[in-house]
């Protein structure tokens, strides 16, 4: 299992075009590119990123846009809203294709405490299918990420979506968001593990007085060995990315200490005989 970094972990610490050379300088073989805003979808900007990625010898596995900028409107009942959102979606897919990404990480519709209408699974499952087909035209697999405030916040939702879409939709497992939703990440693996193709890592420690402290991967108490072993049982063969909020660490070297600790954890799991 390769352990990489998401450029999202550099948010407000370093711009994406500067984060890429930094990742390469540390010998990290693979990354997830987080595109922050519309200007970063522009072909000239994407081309500059592609050149820097090539110079740094970094593989891009996945692309992840700032979801709330357009993804909820992909599921809108208003045709113009949806058409404009699809145009933006396809701009990101085009960017992902140029960067060599294999996967698109999607949040999908927000729940917003039940205040959003028209997100019944029977209505949106065909939309997911359409979006997956559009992504495939760019050579990219659509993956729906579990997110505490979006439609896929409970493991059962993923299982129901799979039943309705015949396995066409794959998933990104996000450890932090699983815990925020009140679940163990392994609950999602049990529900949709055969369809997980991407993993976001963050650590979590249960506090004696209740609540959770989120940590850099390898700095907390989450049982990653068991999680990796369960992924292995489900046939997972992809990478995993350190994807944390940038206010969780003070200095960039902490990212690489975290990466080193995660590689050590991986070596104690079923993936331990692989090179990474």
Q: What are the functions of these language-model segments?
A:
Residues 17, 55, 72-170:
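Active-site acidic/histidine proton-transfer and metal-coordination neighborhood
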Residues 1-4, 13-27, 101, 154-173, ...:
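Histidine-acidic metal/acid-base catalytic patches
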Residues 29-30, 59, 102, 141, ...:
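Residue-level detector of anion-binding/catalytic polar loops
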Residues 45-56, 127-134, 226-230:
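Catalytic-core regions built around general acid/base machinery
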Residues 32, 62, 105, 143, ...:
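Conserved beta-strand positions in the central sheet of alpha/beta enzyme cores
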Residues 8-10, 34-38, 65-68, 109-111, ...:
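Active-site beta-loop-alpha junctions enriched in small/polar residues
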Residues 1-97, 166, 170, 194, ...:
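N-terminal pre-domain/capping segments
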Residues 69-72, 113, 205-210:
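Short acidic/His/Gly/Ser-rich catalytic and metal-binding motifs that mark active-site loops
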